[in-house]
Amino acid sequence: MEKKRRARINVSLEQLKSLLEKHYSHQIRKRKLEKADILELSVKYMRSLQNSLQGLWPVPRGAEQPSGFRSCLPGVSQLLRRGDEVGSGLRCPLVPESAAGSTMDSAGLGQEAPALFRPCTPAVWAPAPAAGGPRSPPPLLLLPESLPGSSASVPPPQPASSRCAESPGLGLRVWRPWGSPGDDLN
């Protein structure tokens, strides 16, 4: 039994030695390596490999990043629902299925994005009512279904460039939680 164990150890050490000769040829060929030398060079090589991989491809510990993302979704969804109760009219809920970690950019190229991940219907910010003091409510968000003369069906998604270009120059006041230039926060 002991002979088999020693034979396995020696075979593994010879394999390590032949692998290390390729990487440390200048150190190995000059002298005969002892078992301790082979093990030391193996540890040195594994540490250098580990350090080089950490710099190239940082991996979060465990699954902290995806689980953190999933834990944020319910809170944001609840915040959006509270916005409905206040009367902001925001009806663009987050999709709970997205907690699985899938995003639009993770889909293969050339494939249609699933209906769950299509952008929400474009909305229009209504101007704020006459200033009622520093704590006046934010302007209301009006979706096409709540605008007069609009149908209740959702229009097809538009490219991001056309959606983003709708708001500039309309003269509408957009509420920002951090405030905007000219707001009196006193």
Curated annotation (Swiss-Prot):
<keyword id="KW-0678">Repressor</keyword>
<protein>
    <recommendedName>
        <fullName>Transcription factor HES-3</fullName>
    </recommendedName>
</protein>
<feature type="region of interest" description="Disordered">
    <location>
        <begin position="128"/>
        <end position="186"/>
    </location>
</feature>
<feature type="domain" description="bHLH">
    <location>
        <begin position="1"/>
        <end position="49"/>
    </location>
</feature>
<keyword id="KW-0804">Transcription</keyword>
<dbReference type="GO" id="GO:0050767">
    <property type="term" value="P:regulation of neurogenesis"/>
</dbReference>
<dbReference type="InterPro" id="IPR036638">
    <property type="entry name" value="HLH_DNA-bd_sf"/>
</dbReference>
<dbReference type="GO" id="GO:0000978">
    <property type="term" value="F:RNA polymerase II cis-regulatory region sequence-specific DNA binding"/>
</dbReference>
<comment type="subunit">
    <text>Transcription repression requires formation of a complex with a corepressor protein of the Groucho/TLE family.</text>
</comment>
<keyword id="KW-0238">DNA-binding</keyword>
<dbReference type="InterPro" id="IPR011598">
    <property type="entry name" value="bHLH_dom"/>
</dbReference>
<dbReference type="GO" id="GO:0000981">
    <property type="term" value="F:DNA-binding transcription factor activity, RNA polymerase II-specific"/>
</dbReference>
<dbReference type="GO" id="GO:0005634">
    <property type="term" value="C:nucleus"/>
</dbReference>
<dbReference type="GO" id="GO:0000785">
    <property type="term" value="C:chromatin"/>
</dbReference>
<dbReference type="InterPro" id="IPR050370">
    <property type="entry name" value="HES_HEY"/>
</dbReference>
<dbReference type="Pfam" id="PF00010">
    <property type="entry name" value="HLH"/>
</dbReference>
<feature type="compositionally biased region" description="Low complexity">
    <location>
        <begin position="142"/>
        <end position="153"/>
    </location>
</feature>
<comment type="function">
    <text>Transcriptional repressor of genes that require a bHLH protein for their transcription.</text>
</comment>
<keyword id="KW-0805">Transcription regulation</keyword>
<keyword id="KW-0539">Nucleus</keyword>
<feature type="domain" description="Orange">
    <location>
        <begin position="65"/>
        <end position="99"/>
    </location>
</feature>
<dbReference type="GO" id="GO:0046983">
    <property type="term" value="F:protein dimerization activity"/>
</dbReference>
<feature type="short sequence motif" description="WRPW motif">
    <location>
        <begin position="175"/>
        <end position="178"/>
    </location>
</feature>
